[in-house]
Amino acid sequence: MLMPKRVKYRKQQRGHNRGMAHRGNTVAFGEYGLMALEATWMTSRQIEAARRAISHHVKRGGKIWIRIFPDKPVTAKPAETRMGSGKGAVDHYVAVIKPGRILFELAGVRPEVAHEALERAAQKLPIKCKIVPREDLEGAA
């Protein structure tokens, strides 16, 4: 599972997830990317399930980049516990996803294989996604 090695502060407030992604919204490393179309908190388990789906489909070929990392701690209190007596312990970590964010990238495989692998990954995720090709900058030399 993905989680930070060490953190400055153990617990965080929830915050608001508004607006579009301004960072990480272009395919930077691979040839194809999986773009989020909705806002969500994505758990490390969901990210791992999607990664496994891609890896299983491309077998030994290709390279996968995971462009998101779960660095936000989510706390939970034990079941059947009365309210009060402080904030609960850290239960798991999530990545905050905004619309337009590239989640995974893939390179080194045929276009139809990449498309199918990313579609299988998208089915494992709690949001709608779309597959985007890399847009190489024209005339940038």
Swiss-Prot record:
Keywords, alphabetical: Ribonucleoprotein, Ribosomal protein, RNA-binding, rRNA-binding, tRNA-binding
PROSITE patterns tied to this protein: RIBOSOMAL_L16_1
Pfam families the UniProt entry points to: Ribosomal_L16 (PF00252)
Domain of life from the UniProt record: Bacteria
A GO cellular component annotation in the UniProt record: cytosolic large ribosomal subunit
GO terms assigned for molecular function: rRNA binding; structural constituent of ribosome; tRNA binding
Keyword Heme: no
Region Disordered, annotated ranges: 1-21
One example of a Gene Ontology biological process annotation: translation
Family per similarity comment: Belongs to the universal ribosomal protein uL16 family.
Subunit annotation: Part of the 50S ribosomal subunit.
PANTHER family: 50S/60S RIBOSOMAL PROTEIN L16 (PTHR12220), LARGE RIBOSOMAL SUBUNIT PROTEIN UL16M (PTHR12220:SF13)
Function: Binds 23S rRNA and is also seen to make contacts with the A and possibly P site tRNAs.
Protein name (Swiss-Prot/TrEMBL): Large ribosomal subunit protein uL16
Source organism: Roseiflexus sp. (strain RS-1)
Gene name of the record: rplP
